[in-house]
Swiss-Prot record:
The keyword Cytoplasm applies. Zn(2+) 2 binds at residues 113, 148, 373. Changing residue 386 to C: In ACY1D; loss of activity. It comes from the Eukaryota. It is found in: Cytoplasm. Its main location: cytoplasm. Its cofactor is Zn(2+). Zn(2+) 1 binds at residues 80, 113, 175. Gene3D superfamilies: 1.10.150.900, 3.30.70.360, Zn peptidases. This is Aminoacylase-1. Expression is highest in kidney, strong in brain and weaker in placenta and spleen. Changing residue 378 to W: In ACY1D; slightly reduced activity.
Amino acid sequence: MTSKGPEEEHPSVTLFRQYLRIRTVQPKPDYGAAVAFFEETARQLGLGCQKVEVAPGYVVTVLTWPGTNPTLSSILLNSHTDVVPVFKEHWSHDPFEAFKDSEGYIYARGAQDMKCVSIQYLEAVRRLKVEGHRFPRTIHMTFVPDEEVGGHQGMELFVQRPEFHALRAGFALDEGIANPTDAFTVFYSERSPWWVRVTSTGRPGHASRFMEDTAAEKLHKVVNSILAFREKEWQRLQSNPHLKEGSVTSVNLTKLEGGVAYNVIPATMSASFDFRVAPDVDFKAFEEQLQSWCQAAGEGVTLEFAQKWMHPQVTPTDDSNPWWAAFSRVCKDMNLTLEPEIMPAATDNRYIRAVGVPALGFSPMNRTPVLLHDHDERLHEAVFLRGVDIYTRLLPALASVPALPSDS
């Protein structure tokens, strides 16, 4: 694949690169510039534009293309505006220049995660409007802040507000991930993030002595139990070629804390873990297992949750789901191979599904290495434009799904 020269660049690519240059990078994203960008785009496309401040400085921008039948539920196209930090010294090009090389690869933070999808939504709508189309169902595009740090000042708040309920969303699309093969990954559920801190208390003393009942000994037992569970899940994944990473529960030890000096046995030590719990796990039983590992380690060992998502939802991927039927039929007609999976990490889709809206995670990037959050994140312009083509076919099908019992 080779690149067109600047004078021949596709206008959709130009808009994509313009958006990539907006520095919505954590921890201090320029959300104001992103909101202004979408306001201007809405004006150009003749779309309704609503700004909802869900927390001070955190604005959800909603662009609306009204359908012909307001009694039907709407299609929600969601994307987040923030991107993760960069280490510029490890990049071949400025991560906020949106540099395009001679082969057509666009280097930028957010190229895959997920500014490409935001512009693909907009450009598909632009194309359909220019062609004179209208569809029964209203299409809303939501551009939300804060996803990369948990969405707690973004979609988590937005779904609780009357402005969200007024959208009457019947089905949603949000981000997926690149796929290095010919296939396209589509996520129908997500693992639940549990951030767990285990604290162990014990006898302090001089570090030259063999003390009993120390905090470190008891914490060591819990760490061993959790890492043994990790190995068991890893082996289960490795031994079954039909399982994907999202189908098992992962855990990583991410932080160890304790101690004040080399020669002092600490009275308190702690270990922090990031669990991603598969949706088919019995959450109550799993929490009891964690508690039992702490109890088995001895007295004075406790756990607390920094994050604990308890609402796993699965969007059906069979013909019992009319949204999936419409989505998959278009992909079949376009000769796109789909690989339905459980999202290993967490996205804003978990908040959308939790309020009863079926949702899929889909970023149309096949034959593309997975580079989200990585150095030299990039996307080929041809892959990006193919994504616009795909949404241009998907949106009419989704927005034309016949009336459903849930619409009332």
